[in-house]
C-alpha cells in the first residue's frame, strides 16, 4: 500500500482545538481504491490471530500538531469469540460490542482491513435492492436522502457519495450491517409483511420509516447488537493508541457535580460516603476524565482501568453500605408509620438519600449543620441547582422529613422532639413541610397520628363548641362515623324504624336513651333541650340559639340543625324520633346509630349536643345526607324558636350554620333542606360562601322564614316552641299518647313526624291541652293525625330505610334523602322566601286545617281503616292530604286554642309553631276565613264528597306508593305497616314542606311572639286536625270529621272558629286536602273547586306531589313536588306562574289573605291545577332564583 494512498474524502465536517474532523477517507485495498465513510461497517482482524470482527467507523480526525490521521471505531464480535462464549440467550444474528471504542491510526486500520473475510457466514441474508430498480421513480435519491438523515447523522455526504461513484462503487461493497435490537426487530417484522414482495419495496419511504432497510450491496448480512463486553486482550494491541483520543471537553465546569455524576453512573450515590471522602471524589473525577478519553483512546482506557480497580472496589464497598443504609432507613421509617413513598426532587434532581446522609454526617449531623447554617453545603453535595434561593431550607426540610428520624434513632435520641414543621407556601416547601410534619409527628408518636387526627377534629369542634370536650366529641364522632358508615339491611332498617316509632312513642326520657344511638341526634337534642329549657323557662330563643351556635360549630350537623331548628328544638328533641320517621335515621336506617340518636337527641342535654358537635365532623356528610329528615326537626325547632324569638333564633341558627359552615351546614341542612341542593351532592354539608351569604341575607332580609331557603323552614316546630306546645298540647297528646307517640315516631321523618315525636314526648302536656281544648274530634283527630303521621311516616321511613338499607349504605341514603329533602325544603323555602308564597301556603294550610276539623272523625275512621288494611297509597295520600289540611286547620285553630299542640308535631303544626307568620296568617285566616270558608264551604262542600273521594283517589296514587317502590322492600310491606309508614313518610314530607312554608310564612308573616304563640296553638290544633283529617280516607268519615272538625275548630279558637266556621270546616275539609298544598302545588292548590281537584287523577296527582314530594324529599318522584322545589314544577307555564301569582297576590294582602287564597289560588287550582301559576311567574318569584 503506497504511503500516499491515504487521503481524506470530502470536505472537513468539524473543527475543535487541534482536531479537524472528516467524513471519509480513501485507501487502496488489493490495488483498488476504496472509500470508508462514517457509519460504515466492515470486517477487520485486529491481529492475524484474532477472530474476524465487524468495525463501525464512528470518527475520523486529523491532529494538526502531530499530523496524525486517526480513527475511532466500535468493534463487534460474535458471541463465541467473547470470553463468556455463546449461550442459549444469544440470537443467531447477534453480535456483542466491545465496551470501549478503539482509537487506531488510519494506517493501522487499513492493515486490519487487509484480510480474507470469506469465511464469515453469520448474519441474516437480506435481499439486495437492484440498482436498476433504484434508478426508477427517484428511489435512489430517496434512499440517499434517508441514509444521509439517519445513518449519517445529518451530515452532508453528497461529496463522499460522488467520490464513491467516481470510483465505480455505485454498488456499495458494504456486506454487513449491525443494527440495534429494536431496529432488527422492526426490520424482521417488515420483512415478514413484505415477504411476497420484491426487495425494492424496502426503498419506499414508508417501508424505511417503519424499519425497513434498503441494502444495495450484493450479499448484505444483517446482524444486531444488544450487549457489550470487556475485551481482555484488546488493550494490549499495539495498534490501539488511546493516548490520541481527542479531548473534546469544553471549558472547565464545577468539579462538585463530577463525583455525583460519576456516582450516578457507577451506582454509587455519594462519593463522600466513601471513607476516602473527597479523595475518592477526586479519584472519581480523574477516573471520569480518563474514562472519557478511553471512549476514544484505548491507551487511556488501559491506564484508567488500572486506576479504576481500587476505585471500583471502593465503589462496590460504597454500594453495599448504601444498600444497607437504604434498607435500614426504609424499614425504620415504615415502622414509625412514616414510610418514604416518593423521594422528592431538589434542584431538578432526585435526592440521593445516601449521599445526603453521608454529607450530613460528615458535617456533624443535623444539629451541627443547622447551628452552623451549612445546609447549602448539603445542597451542593447533592448537585442541586446553584441558582436556587431556597436551597438550604428545602434541603433541611427534606432531611427532617426523610432522614432525621432515622438519624435520631441511630444516635439513641428518638425521644428528642423533631423540629416543628412550618407550612410552606412554595410547592416544594409545602410538600416537604407537610411530609416532614407527617413523618415527624408520626415518628415522634406512632399513636399520635390517629390521635392527632382525632384531636384535630376535636380541636375545631371544641372551638366551634367550647362546651364539648374533645374526647367525648371524638368518641361521639367516631360512633357517628361508624353508624353512618355502616349501612343496615332493609329489614334492619325497618326494625330500626319501628324502634324509632317506639322511641318516639316512648316518653322523652326513655327516648333519651337513643342518644347513645345517635350522637348527631343527641347534638340536635342537646340544642333542643337547651331550647326546650329556654322555651319552658323564659329563656329567649336568641339565647338558646346562641347556645346552640356555640355548640353549632361542633354540632355542625346536629347542633347546626338544632340552632336552625332551635325554635322547635324542644319539639324536635321530643320528636327527634324524627330520625325514626326518617327511614334514614340510624334506627330506621342502619345508617348510623348517631342519627337515630337524633331522635334520642331530642330529649338529650346540651352535653349531648356538645357530643354531637364533637362528632359533627364525622357526621357532616352524613348529616348533609340526612338533611331532609333533620329538616323536619329543624323546621320544628325553628318554628318553636320563631314562636318565641323566631327571627333571632333562626338567624342565630343560620349564624351557627355559618360557623359550622362545613359540619353545621350539614346539620342545619336538617332545617335547611335546600342546603343539599345548594351544595354539591358529594358535599351536601359544605356551603359555598355565596350560598351562605344568600342564605343569611334571606334569613335576615326575608324575615327569617324566607331566609331559610335552604331548609330553615323544615324546623317548623322549634324544640323550645314544641315544649310550650307540648305543655299546651300535653293534654292532647296524652289523650292519644300511645298512638300519637308511635305515629310521631314513625312520622319523625318529616316535620310532621317531628311534631308527632314531640307529641309522644309532650303527649302528657298535650293531654292537658286536650283537656283544655277537649274536642272529641280534635282529640280523636290528634291520634288520627298521629296515626296518619305514623302511617305516612312509617311508609316514608320504611321507604327511607328500605331504600338505603337494601341497596345503599346509610351515607348514601342520607345523601339521597337529604337531596330530596333539600329539594322539598328548597321549594318550600322558596315559597316562604316569597311573601306571596308564604301567604299562599298559609292559606292552603288554613284550608287544610278547616277541612281537617270537619274530617277529624273521617280521618279517625280512615286512619283506622288504613291501619287495618286500606291501600297504603290511596289512604296515605288521602290521609296525607287530610293530614295536611288538618295541620293547616289546626295551625289556624291553635291560634284560638293552643290545645292542639298535638298537631304541632305535624308538618303544618310545625310551620304554625314557627307561626310568627302563622299568627299573621291566622289573623288573615280568621279575618278572611269567613269569605274563604263561605267560598270554601260551597266550593268544598260542593266538592266535599269529591274532595274526599278525590283525596282518597289521590291517596291511592299516594306518593308513599312511589316511595315504596323506590324503597325496594317497602312496597311489599306497604300494605299494612308500610301504609302507616308511608303516611308517616308523607307526613314527614308534608311536615317538612309545611314547616318550610310555614317557616317562611312565619318569619315573613312575622309577627310578634304572640302571633307565633297563637301560631303554635293553631299549629297544634291544625296538626291534630290534619292528622285526623289525613287519617280519614272515607268520604263519609271525612264529612263527619269535617263536621267534627268544624265543631272542634269553633270550640278551639274564636278566631279559627269564626274564620273557619262549621261550613268553613267542611269546606276546608274538602279544600284542606287539595288546598293545603294547592297554593303551593299549582295543581292541587289551584283546585279551589275541590271538585276539580277532587277527581282521583287530579287530587291524586296533586296530593301525590304535595304529600310525597313536599312531605318527603324521598318522594322526588312526585312530579309536582320536585318541580315545585326545583322550579321545575313551576315550569309548567300555567301551573308555576299562576301558583306564584297567587302566592304573590295572597302575600301582599294581609287581611284578604284568605280571600286571595280562596279566590285566586283555590279556584284556579281547582279548575286548572297546572294553570294555577304561570311557569314564568313562578320562576321569577321562586326563591330558587336567589340561590
Swiss-Prot record:
Keyword entries, A-Z: Activator, DNA-binding, Isopeptide bond, Methylation, Nucleus, Phosphoprotein, Transcription, Transcription regulation, Ubl conjugation
Start and end residues of each stretch annotated as Disordered: 251-279, 413-611, 891-977, 1032-1065
Domain ARID, first and last residues per copy: 319-411
Cited InterPro entries: ARID/SWI1_ChromRemod, ARID5B_ARID/BRIGHT_DNA-bd, ARID_dom, ARID_dom_sf
Residues that bear Phosphoserine: 264, 1032, 1132
Biased amino acid composition, Basic and acidic residues: 447-459, 512-522, 1036-1048
GO aspect biological process, one term: positive regulation of DNA-binding transcription factor activity
Biased composition range(s): Low complexity: 460-469, 527-537, 1055-1065
Domain of life of the native organism: Eukaryota
CDD domains in the record: ARID_ARID5B
Subcellular compartments: Nucleus
Free-text domain note: The ARID domain mediates the interaction with DNA.
Its biological purpose: Transcription coactivator that binds to the 5'-AATA[CT]-3' core sequence and plays a key role in adipogenesis and liver development. Acts by forming a complex with phosphorylated PHF2, which mediates demethylation at Lys-337, leading to target the PHF2-ARID5B complex to target promoters, where PHF2 mediates demethylation of dimethylated 'Lys-9' of histone H3 (H3K9me2), followed by transcription activation of target genes. The PHF2-ARID5B complex acts as a coactivator of HNF4A in liver.
Family named by the database record: Belongs to the ARID5B family.
Name of the protein described by the UniProt record: AT-rich interactive domain-containing protein 5B
